[in-house]
């Protein structure tokens, strides 16, 4: 059942915002008003479409009492009634609580798990998969930290991804990704299983998270290249430790000033993510509105090379086009995960 009082409140708020922006009072707040107005517009459009449909149905029902108009009404009413469920579903979707982080840029972190060199190679495959997907979306990917292995794998990669709805599209990628394949170093042709962990964090702004300078320990050290050799002769790498949580962030570009900026950016994102997780836990002990448990240690997906298969275990989705997926063709997976999360939210709201 759609709450009519809420529809009225949203419409009245939208009209107020429209009038406030037209008046131009309080110029400092115009940006905030415009943002809220923009967020409400698609909701109000769905409300208008739904209310128009109800109004048309009411008019058609009245026409049944007019002998001249009754044939037209009898033809129109079934069409209007058949359109009603779709309009209700679209409106319910528009009314779902919005994650304010959805429009934010994101930090992507990938680290190998069990599996040694093969896990590091798989971590590299995953990073390239996300890079290719970002290209298809027109997003910008900036590398923050990259530690490679001698075989071309990745020990750790941290990247900043900026563009439209980055976090909304990538947030369900967090978790353990498992690969089953024959390693190139395996002479016996045996299939090995290894894993890598992906974390996608929304970028945090100062308004999102406050960090007390007294809670930080900042160390400088020599940057190291492959094999551990020093890549310059000055102390440029920066390590920041957040003492209350024990979180440690490092950055090792050539500029110490830039390293400090990058490390703080990553630290803010991780602390913001911790706070979001804490709030989510308080709101829903069973995390019913999330895809999976939301736990980064949860195995979310398996990439089976011998079968050319990708399976997402949270929604039991299996695709037999692994090559395309690893080339960045992720929309079908992401759309299915998003739809599943929305369906869970709707069910949760209906309880």
Curated annotation (Swiss-Prot):
Signal peptide: none annotated. Keywords: Cytoplasm, Methylation, Protein biosynthesis. GO terms for cellular component: cytoplasm. The keyword Cytoplasm applies. Residues 278-297 are annotated as: Disordered. It is found in: Cytoplasm. The modification N5-methylglutamine is found at residue 229. GO terms for molecular function: translation release factor activity, codon specific. It comes from the Bacteria. Methylated by PrmC. Methylation increases the termination efficiency of RF1. Pfam families: PCRF (PF03462), RF-1 (PF00472). Belongs to the prokaryotic/mitochondrial release factor family. Peptide chain release factor 1 directs the termination of translation in response to the peptide chain termination codons UAG and UAA. This is Peptide chain release factor 1.
């Amino acid at each position: 059942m759609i709450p009519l009082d809420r529809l009225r409140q949203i419409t009245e708020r939208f009209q107020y915002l429209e009038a406030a922006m037209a008046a131009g009072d309080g110029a400092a707040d115009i940006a905030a008003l415009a943002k809220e107005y923009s967020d409400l517009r698609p909701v109000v459009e769905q409300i208008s479409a739904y209310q128009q449909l109800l109004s048309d149905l009411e008019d058609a029902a009245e026409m049944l009492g007019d002998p001249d108009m009754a044939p037209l009404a009898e033809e129109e009413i079934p069409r209007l009634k058949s359109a009603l469920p779709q309009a209700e579903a679209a409106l319910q979707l528009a009314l779902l609580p919005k994650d304010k982080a959805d429009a934010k840029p994101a930090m992507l972190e990938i680290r190998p798990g069990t599996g040694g060199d093969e896990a590091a190679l798989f971590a590299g495959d995953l990073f390239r998969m996300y890079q290719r997907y970002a290209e298809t979306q027109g997003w910008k990917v900036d590398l923050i930290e990259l530690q490679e292995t001698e075989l071309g794998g990745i020990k750790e990669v941290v990247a900043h991804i900026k563009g439209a709805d980055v976090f909304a599209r990538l947030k369900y990628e967090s978790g353990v990704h498992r690969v089953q394949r024959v390693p190139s170093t395996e002479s016996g042709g045996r299939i090995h299983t290894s894993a890598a962990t992906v974390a996608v964090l929304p970028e945090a702004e100062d308004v999102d998270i406050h960090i007390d300078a007294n809670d930080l320990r900042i160390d400088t050290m020599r940057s190291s290249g492959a094999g551990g050799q020093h890549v310059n002769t000055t102390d440029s790498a920066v390590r920041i430790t957040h003492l209350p949580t024990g979180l440690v962030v490092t950055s090792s570009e050539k500029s110490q000033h830039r390293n400090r900026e990058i490390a703080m950016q990553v630290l803010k994102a991780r602390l913001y993510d911790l706070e979001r997780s804490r709030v989510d836990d308080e709101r829903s002990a069973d995390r019913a509105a999330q895809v999976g448990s939301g736990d980064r240690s949860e195995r979310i997906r398996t990439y089976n090379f011998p079968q050319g298969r990708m399976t997402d275990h949270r929604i039991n989705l299996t695709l037999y086009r692994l090559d395309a997926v690893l080339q960045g063709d992720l929309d079908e997976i992401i759309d299915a995960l998003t739809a599943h999360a929305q369906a869970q939210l709707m069910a949760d709201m209906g309880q």
